[in-house]
């Protein structure tokens, strides 16, 4: 899995690496991760990408280590793969601990957690712990997103016992000791917090029993409140408000980054829309539709720029990536699009807001193209998007067999 880079391309990349200083007045911040995590404040050098074999049972899930250092001679190459040691996990989302020393990786189907040491040697992460009995420990199934809070990890769990019914949040120490489960009234997908307001919001999708079936057998009537967002008291881990929309499957959510910002956004997959949540003076939240992303988009992920000027939406069904201008938070506008990128799913924006990496596998049961890859979009100072023609890792032609790349983190 190598990029075909000419000597000229490498030379240009190295030259570009030396010019990554931000222009005066621009903001740098790592986005779309917990505010408790020690932030990356310099250009990325390595990417960790959590992936699974394209064919069920075709091998173990793995953490790919990718060189993304523009000044490196191995830029754009998969340096190694760290195996999970088991099959059938359905590798999905990953998250750092607050001190950025460990990476937690969740598995949708097997209810396992994999903990990697990424601090001792960042270029050579090591699998140091596997938690096998998550369902028995927590009473919850379908682990989705590991999210850092001080000294602990909260994992959004989609469903209850046996993959059915509402899920909740499972709380662990950074080392993997189970603390408690916190029941939800829907199927938690993602978590975002705003510590200054003592508020946490979780979005929703569907239970584990759904995605483990072929798409033709999915039954939305078995889903619990998939059109809701839950507002929690962060310290008490208690639900204090339910935000409801007519559209179902409220996936990725992002809180505005600016200190004191009382608003944020999430996407509705079934409703092809962006929604805005906003904290009012009385402590409750307003919730309204902010924009339609277009019929047939099938929004899968939502990311933001470090300066709160742009949102990025991946349209999994329509094969495009959208940039939305949110400089006026109450009146957001479509700013730019890239089309023809096959089933884009997870994205990651760099600390300087100039690069957006994306993968193109969602879940084994709904992927519709076998052209699996990880690609890069360059973001101009004007917010315009341009697909980088020199950066593409073809996971469909991986040496050990085709693989589905899902979530990624930079270091």
For each predicted feature, which ranges?
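Asp-box/WD-like beta-propeller blade repeats and closely related beta-sheet repeat scaffolds
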Residues: 121-196
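Beta-rich, blade/repeat-based domains predominating
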Residues: 31-38, 85-98, 136-152, 185-199, ...
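Short loop/turn segments immediately following beta-strands, especially the blade-tip
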Residues: 66-74, 115-125, 234-237, 276-285, ...
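Beta-strand-rich domains and repeat architectures in extracellular enzymes and scaffolds
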Residues: 29-68, 74-108
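Beta-propeller domains
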Residues: 97, 185, 194-322
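Blade-loop segments of beta-propeller domains
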Residues: 75-147
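Short, conserved, GDST-rich strand-edge loop motifs in beta-rich repeat architectures
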Residues: 41, 49-57, 156-165, 203-226, ...
């Amino acid at each position: 899995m190598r990029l075909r880079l000419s000597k000229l391309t490498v030379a240009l990349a190295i030259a570009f690496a030396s010019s990554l200083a931000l222009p005066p007045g621009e903001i740098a911040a790592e986005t779309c991760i917990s505010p408790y995590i020690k932030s990356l404040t310099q250009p990325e050098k390595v990417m960790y990408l959590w992936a699974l074999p394209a064919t069920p049972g075709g091998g173990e899930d793995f953490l790919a280590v990718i060189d993304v250092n523009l000044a490196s001679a191995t830029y754009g190459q998969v340096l190694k793969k760290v195996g999970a040691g088991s099959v059938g996990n359905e590798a999905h989302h990953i998250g750092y601990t607050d001190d950025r020393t460990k990476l937690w990786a969740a598995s949708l189907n097997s209810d396992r957690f994999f903990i990697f040491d990424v601090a001792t040697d960042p270029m050579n992460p090591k699998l140091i712990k596997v938690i096998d009995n998550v369902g028995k420990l927590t009473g919850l199934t379908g682990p989705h997103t590991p999210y850092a809070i001080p000294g602990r990890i909260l994992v959004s769990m989609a469903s209850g016992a046996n993959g059915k019914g509402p899920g909740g949040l499972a709380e662990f120490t950074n080392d993997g000791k189970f603390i408690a489960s916190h029941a939800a009234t829907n199927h938690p997908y993602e978590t975002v917090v705003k510590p200054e307001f003592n508020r946490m919001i979780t979005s929703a999708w569907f239970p584990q029993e759904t995605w483990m079936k072929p798409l033709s057998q999915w039954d939305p009537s078995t889903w619990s409140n998939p059109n809701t967002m839950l507002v929690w008291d962060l310290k008490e881990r208690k639900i204090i408000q339910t935000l409801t929309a007519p559209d179902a499957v409220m996936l990725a959510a992002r809180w505005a980054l600016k200190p004191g910002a009382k608003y944020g956004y999430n996407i509705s997959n079934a409703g092809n829309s962006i929604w805005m949540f906003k904290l009012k003076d009385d402590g409750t939240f307003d919730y309204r539709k902010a924009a339609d992303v277009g019929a047939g988009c099938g929004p899968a992920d939502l990311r933001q720029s470090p300066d709160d000027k742009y949102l990025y939406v991946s349209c999994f069904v329509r094969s495009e990536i959208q940039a939305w201008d949110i400089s006026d938070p109450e009146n957001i506008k479509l700013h730019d699009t890239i089309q023809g990128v096959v089933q884009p799913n997870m994205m990651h924006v760099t600390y300087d807001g100039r690069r957006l990496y994306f993968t193109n596998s969602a879940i084994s049961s709904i992927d519709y193209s076998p052209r699996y890859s990880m690609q890069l979009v360059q973001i101009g100072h004007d917010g315009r998007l341009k697909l980088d023609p020199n950066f593409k890792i073809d996971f469909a032609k991986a040496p050990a067999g085709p693989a589905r790349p899902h979530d990624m983190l930079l270091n």
